[in-house]
Amino acid sequence: MSLKAIATTLGISVTTVSRALGGFSDVAASTRERVEAEARRRGYRPNTQARRLKTGKTDAIGLVYPENDVPFNSGVFMDMVSCISRELAYHDIDLLLIADDEHADCHSYMRLVESRRIDALIIAHTLDDDPRITHLHKAGIPFLALGRVPQGLPCAWFDFDNHAGTWQATQKLIALGHKSIALLSENTSHSYVIARRQGWLDALHEHGLKDPLLRLVSPTRRAGYLAVMELMSLPAPPTAIITDNDLSGDGAAMALQLRGRLSGKEAVSLVVYDGLPQDSIIELDVAAVIQSTRSLVGRQISDMVYQIINGASPESLQITWTPIFYPGSTVHSPSF
C-alpha cells in the first residue's frame, strides 16, 4: 500500500500525505485526521527503516530494572510495564527490558545507548544516591527516572510521594489509638523504600512514639509471613502492622489469619502498600495505600518519555503524584 493511493483517494498531494503521517505541524489537523483515517482503513504501515533513516530515531525505549532484585514477581511492576508498552505502541515505539546491576561500574544499557539502538531510557527502582543518574546526565543521554532525583540535577522524573503514603497510614493508626505500629520494609536501598520507611518514622516521632518495630525483609510472601509470625511471638506484639509492598503484605495477612488475628476481638490492624495482589487468597477488604491505577501510571510515564524523545526540556518533566489511604476493613482501634 503506497502513499500515492491514499493521496489519490483523498485528492491531495503525496507530499501532504507524507507530512501528515509524519506528524508535521504545517499540516492542518482536519487533513491529518483524514489521512490517518484513510491509512487505517487501508491497513497502511509506514516503512519503518526509511522513517528511522529520515528521523534518526530507533523507535525503541529501554526500561532498566535491577538484575539483583528482579521485580517480575511483583504484579504492580509487571502491570506498569505492560501499560507503558501498550501506550508506547500507539506511537509505534517498542519497549525493551534491560537487566542491570545498579552498583556496577559498567552498565549493560550503555551498549544499547552507544550503538544507537534506543532513543531514551526509563530507569526503574532508582537508588537514594544513584550514580547512574549522574552518569546519564553528564553523558547527555535522554532518560526518565522512576523516582525523584535527590542529586538536584535537571532531569526528568516521575514519582509518587512515598513518604506521604506511609505517613498518612501511620497517622490514621495513631489517631485510632495505636502506639505499637510495626513496619515490614524492603531490605533494599531503593529511593521509594527509604521514603516509605521515613514516612512511617516521622509520623511516629511526631507523636513521641519510640522504639519502632522495624523489620527489613525481602519483598516476598514468605518473608512477610515469617516476619509477622515472629512479631506476634513477642511478649508485647504490635497492635498494627504496615507493609511497604503487596507481596510481603500478602504474607503478613496470611500469618495473621493463621493466628486468628486478622479479624475478631484480638485483630491486629493491617495496612498494605499497593493493596493485596490479585491472586491473594485473603478475602477480607484489607486497608491499603493506593497509588492510582496501573493504566493511568503507564499512560503518564509513556507520555513523558514521548515528550523527552521529541525534545521537551527535562526540567519541565518532574511530576509527583500523592497516594491515598484506603481504610478497608482491617483498620480499627487496638483490640488488646
From Swiss-Prot:
Keywords noted in UniProt: DNA-binding, Plasmid, Repressor, Transcription, Transcription regulation
InterPro entries for this protein: HTH_LacI (IPR000843), Lambda_DNA-bd_dom_sf (IPR010982), Peripla_BP/Lac1_sug-bd_dom (IPR001761), Peripla_BP_I (IPR028082)
A Pfam family per the record: Peripla_BP_1
PROSITE patterns xref list: HTH_LACI_2
HTH lacI-type domain location: 2-55
UniProt-recorded Gene Ontology molecular function terms: DNA-binding transcription factor activity; transcription cis-regulatory region binding
Name this protein carries in UniProt: HTH-type transcriptional regulator RafR
Source taxonomy: Bacteria, Pseudomonadati, Pseudomonadota, Gammaproteobacteria, Enterobacterales
